[in-house]
A protein has these predicted regions:
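N-terminal secretory signal peptides that target proteins for export/translocation
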Residues: 1-7
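Flexible, solvent-exposed loop/hinge segments and secondary-structure transition points
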Residues: 25-167
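Bacterial N-terminal signal peptides
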Residues: 9-24
């Protein structure tokens, strides 16, 4: 009887183990699109050139899906703070999937929002998420123009330049 119970328990354990391994084996790999370096460079350069054409010296940062810097360019004649600001704007837009300037309104609605304590967080306008459909694959931030709305206009020009490749 003891052997029968032991054998039954071993068979049950084997069945459970085989089922679990079968589930793991049938798991799917994640499939997603990421920004290439060449697209990120085009976005950053176009944003900087657009602002320059309007008389503004800016820096630009493009971050990828995980908030990592893909390209960061300090524009000619920009202040040293523009590199950090452009990154914070891009990181915020990527993290929340919204224009960085919208964070100010969200923070006013919820002053206890934990996001304000994140390293790299800002409420400054001047960054937009980069999307393929509804999937946020990165973001670009610009800093240096006199006003976040001007930074954001340059960002939009950069994204628009590669819009046909974001599919």
């Amino acid at each position: 009887m003891f052997r029968s119970t032991l054998r039954s328990g071993a068979l049950t354990f084997g069945y459970v183990l085989a089922s679990a391994l079968g589930s793991i084996a049938s798991a799917q790999l994640l499939n997603h699109k990421d920004l290439s370096a060449s697209i990120a460079i085009t976005i950053a350069q176009t944003a900087i050139e657009t602002c320059k054409a309007n008389g503004y010296a800016v820096s630009a940062t493009v971050v990828g899906r995980n908030g990592e810097v893909i390209v960061q360019i300090r524009g000619d004649g920009t202040g040293p703070h523009t590199m950090e600001n452009s990154f914070k704007k891009a990181f915020t837009a990527r993290t929340f999937g919204i224009p960085s300037g919208e964070m100010e309104d969200r923070l006013k609605q919820n002053p206890q929002m934990g996001a304000q304590y994140l390293t790299g967080f800002t409420t400054a306008q001047g960054a937009l998420p980069i999307k393929v459909g509804e999937d946020v694959i990165g973001a670009v931030g610009v800093s240096g123009a006199p006003g976040g709305e001007k930074d954001e206009a340059c960002v939009k020009a950069g994204i628009d330049k590669v819009a046909d490749q974001l599919k």
